[in-house]
From Swiss-Prot:
This is Porphobilinogen deaminase. It comes from Staphylococcus aureus (strain NCTC 8325 / PS 47). GO terms for biological process: heme biosynthetic process; protoporphyrinogen IX biosynthetic process. The porphobilinogen subunits are added to the dipyrromethane group. Its EC number is 2.5.1.61.
């Protein structure tokens, strides 16, 4: 196998999960020589604005995909939730490895349970999806925008006027934070995850047979089926980052895929949700999308997209 160059965002989390994936590859192919090339993306350069207000898809991947096309790197290790549902022609997701915990972590300054936070308590999140679902269940709470990496957000929780923050559990775990700092992990009924949350997507050129063969050795087919249902739903709903959209699939005991799709308004007042089982992930994602459109969810999406 030739020497491989991996493209990664420059953040501590991105570099850590890239190294963890490289270790996984070396476990099946010990003699691999791999180097990481750090790439700064548009999303990394925007630190003073809410990403949903910037607009556009692929804020964290476009520059990395460009490096793949230019053959400056051989593969890219993405957080799958950052990858738009349509992959450019000539590139492919060469593998979906094991998924980390896909749920969100709720961290309270005083370790107060979410259901017991006093009226007017301020929760920090940079995600419309999280904000909408929290306001839907707890309209007496206040959502305040927060940006920055995990360390920055944890520091802001202590030094600014946040009573609690919500972060992806996967990032905390990959960075080695213990469960001690987490007040609770929020289950799917409290906070349905983002599309592909906790999963990685390994992107490479579609014609790189040698690399695709290597990547197949660390591919998790069950996770791939689940995230395919989720990503199909996202593509069918045409959900941009202005739309609170969530979707989560699991494999049932009967070996079927169970998928829940969710569309909301940012204020949490309108909610469209549907769950169903199936065996074909693409069909499942499309069917749930159609069910939500029948309920009126597409009107929300059109309205929110027109506002921006």
């Amino acid at each position: 196998m030739r020497k491989l160059v991996v493209g990664s965002r420059r953040s501590k989390l991105a570099l850590t999960q890239s190294q963890q994936f490289i270790d996984k590859l070396k476990a099946v192919e010990p003699n691999l020589e791999i180097e990481i090339k750090e790439i700064v993306t548009k999303g990394d350069r925007i630190v003073d604005k809410q990403l949903s207000k910037v607009g556009g898809k692929g804020l964290f991947v476009k520059e990395i995909q460009h490096e793949l096309f230019e053959k400056n790197i051989d593969m890219a290790i993405h957080s799958l939730k950052d990858v738009p549902s349509v992959i450019p022609e000539g590139l492919t997701l060469g593998c979906i490895p094991d998924r980390e915990l896909p749920f969100d972590a709720y961290i309270s300054k005083t370790h107060t349970p979410l259901s017991q936070l006093p009226e007017g308590s301020i929760i920090g999140t940079s995600s419309l999806r999280r904000g909408a679902q929290i306001l839907s269940k707890y309209p007496n709470l206040e959502i305040k925008w927060i940006r920055g990496n995990i360390d920055t957000r944890l520091e802001k929780l202590q030094t600014e006027d946040y009573d609690a923050i919500i972060l992806a559990a996967a990032g905390l775990r990959r960075m080695g934070w213990s469960d001690d700092i987490v007040t609770s992990y929020l289950d799917r009924d409290t906070l349905l995850p983002a599309i592909g949350q906790g999963a990685l997507g390994i992107e490479c050129r579609s014609d790189d047979e040698e690399l695709l063969t290597l990547l197949s050795k660390v591919h998790n087919d069950e996770v791939a089926k689940c995230v395919t249902a989720e990503r199909t739903f996202l593509a069918e709903m045409d959900g941009s980052c202005q739309v609170p959209i969530a979707g989560y699939a699991t494999i049932s005991d009967q070996n079927e895929i169970e998928f829940t799709g969710l569309i909301m308004t940012p204020d949490g007042k309108e909610r469209f949700e549907y769950t169903m089982n199936g065996t074909d992930p693409v069909e499942l994602g499309k069917t749930v999308s159609n069910k939500l459109k029948e309920q009126g969810a597409y009107e929300i999406i059109k309205r929110l997209n027109e506002q921006h």
